[in-house]
């Protein structure tokens, strides 16, 4: 509640807010992630209780904004590997995760995501 007076402008939730058991700066390789039926990442409710019942980061963002600060989240590019393995449907599309994923496009330090072909319009529903 006193951050703004000390020059803070932004509050950013760092990576792996969608991983229920993240507890340190170490990644859990191939950990289960929280996502909706379309493979879109959701906040882990056990770590962000205000996200319950589909609220997402809305309540937390509103609180941060009420303090006069800006709210953001760290996101990784691509589609969750878990969505590809489950072959989730892509929102507003007749396509599925395996059709848009570039499984050879991976991040060397984080195993959560596969790349998505940016030229492939079928992948826009995951964004």
Predicted segments, located by residue:
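Aromatic-lined carbohydrate-binding/catalytic grooves of carbohydrate-active enzymes
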Residues: 1-127
